[in-house]
Amino acid sequence: MNKLYIGNVSEQASALDLESIFEQWKIPFSAPFLVKSGYAFVDCPDEKVAMRAIDTLSGKVELHGKVLEVEHSVPKRQRSCKLQIRNIPPHMQWEVLDGLLAQYGTVESCEQVNTDTETAVVNVRYGAKDQAREAMDKLNGFLMENYALKVSYIPDETAAADAPAVGGRRGFNPRGPPRQGSPSLGARPKLQSDVPLRLLVPTQFVGAIIGKEGATIRNITKQTHSKIDIHRKENAGAAEKPITVHSTPEGCSSACRNIMEIMQKEAIDTKITEEIPLKILAHNNFVGRLIGKEGRNLKKIEQDTDTKITISPLQDLTLYNPERTITVKGTLDACAKAEEEIMKKVRESYENDVAAMHLQSNLIPGLNLNALGLFPGAASGGISPSVVSGPPPGAQAGYQSFGAQMESETVHLFIPALAVGAIIGKQGQHIKQLSRFAGASIKIAPADGIDAKQRMVIISGPPEAQFKAQGRIFGKLKEENFFGPKEEVKLEAHIKVPSFAAGRVIGKGGKTVNELQNLTSAEVVVPRDQTPDENDQVVVKITGHFYASQLAQRKIQEIISQVRRQQQPKPSAAGPPVARRK
């Protein structure tokens, strides 16, 4: 992208005029200017120089009474789904931009571009041409925090092939190597950069980290190729403030070390004698795996880095604050090494969770997995809030049919008897929160006996409530280390089906149930010779990990719905009978 288009060129302008402007601003060019009526083209040595020309000249330099407009030269056939957005406010929250971009369609990827300017630049790919065109029309000149956005097309190499990829989850790449897609595209990209580093720093050090007129934080940002958000306005009066670092793992670690060095220097200058520990915020979903079975993972990190690590208690969590504080004490070098190891484990956990989520997401039509709160949200700098605003484009029909099926279902989920306390929580607090969050009725059935190894959780609610409630229970068992760090949580779930539909679930010669097991990876058993209960229902047993179990439950409910529809009497052509008056 080193070829430039220069617009709004005066009829009096010549190639020499344009050459002198580029020379005046010390912008090299690698070929003569091609001047046409009202516009011109020129080649730059590389993309970085082209970006500098756009930032320096576009809308700022006048020639013969006309202000030049400079942007990437894009052939018509390549003006498809890719846009470049420039002049983004430097300290803007990425979630805000994410939400803005999402208003115009599916954002398949968004890569931040390295520039020498204070403002940020991103390359965005939309899922369709019309979405990109609408975003271009609406966002060009759009004011954000007194900065007017500048939007232009950039070459879309795939446009000629006419094969745009299917839309996926939005995510912003940090400064550094482009992420090359998003988790829901066909090829599995590297996901480490999706997990920002979240730090908690004493409020008295925030000023030193920012520096005079933001010079220090700008310097860190430039050196480490990162995007750093200091959340000064959060929790007014709090003793500590969160900092979010978006970058590659190496960039995050480098920024973390710089911030620790500044805090240590400030502590010495202000004669603070107590130790300043490193505090990392991590979503609770990942902490169980960070700790490991019997604390083995955490102990190993402590031994390898010569640090002392503590983690805030579960009681501090709420539905609105799902993060735990990991406190690391040791020398600066030791803390920096511990941060690398801790975040490596967190990123691995995130990558595994997202892989599992997207593996099954396309198999459950219309279910917006990101909206269900099973994975880190914007609070922890993870998946952004615009993702949860509704179903993905293209899944509208599925979403509506899913939403229309609001009939309540009852599922019996069997958990280890020892886990009952963790699910209920202190004075029943956790199970109440879970019930409110999921919109489901959740009850723990009495134990079958003193030596019972399992307890039954009775969950009643519509499909989405089932998904939320069961997902949180699976997650809780993992967090509380009832399963090993590399062990999948597999639970048995029982659902009741009408006896007249049991044969359809099994299929001829067991064909349907076998296909169901192959599709979902869950074990599905319809016990033979069951006596139907008083409601003429029999039990179907499903055993598997969360997504396998969910998919099997949904498929079985689909079969039941089909059977019920087929059994409904067809309406008479003559219409309903008219009631006679007595």
Swiss-Prot record:
UniProt domain RRM: residue ranges: 2-75, 81-156
Modified residue annotations for Phosphoserine: S182
GO molecular function annotations of the record: mRNA 3'-UTR binding; mRNA binding; N6-methyladenosine-containing RNA reader activity
Xref: PROSITE patterns: KH_TYPE_1, RRM
Start and end residues of each KH domain: 194-259, 275-342, 408-473, 490-556
Signal sequence interval, chain numbering: none
Annotated GO biological process: CRD-mediated mRNA stabilization; germ cell development; germ cell migration; mRNA transport; nervous system development; regulation of embryonic development; regulation of translation; sex determination
One cellular-component annotation, GO: P-body
SUPFAM superfamilies listed in its UniProt record: Eukaryotic type KH-domain (KH-domain type I), RNA-binding domain, RBD
Keywords: Cytoplasm, mRNA transport, Nucleus, Phosphoprotein, Repeat, RNA-binding, Translation regulation, Transport
Main location: cytoplasm
Protein localization: Cytoplasm; Nucleus; Cytoplasm, P-body; Cytoplasm, Stress granule
Region annotation (Disordered) ranges: 164-190, 562-582
Family: Belongs to the RRM IMP/VICKZ family.
Role, per record: RNA-binding factor that may recruit target transcripts to cytoplasmic protein-RNA complexes (mRNPs). This transcript 'caging' into mRNPs allows mRNA transport and transient storage. It also modulates the rate and location at which target transcripts encounter the translational apparatus and shields them from endonuclease attacks or microRNA-mediated degradation. Preferentially binds to N6-methyladenosine (m6A)-containing mRNAs and increases their stability. Involved in neuronal crest migration.
Domain remarks in the Swiss-Prot or TrEMBL record: All KH domains contribute binding to target mRNA. Domains KH3 and KH4 are the major RNA-binding modules, although KH1 and KH2 also contribute. They are also required for RNA-dependent homo- and heterooligomerization. The integrity of KH domains seems not to be required for localization to stress granules.
Self-association and partners: Homodimer and multimer.
Name of the protein in question: Insulin-like growth factor 2 mRNA-binding protein 3
Source organism: Danio rerio (Zebrafish)
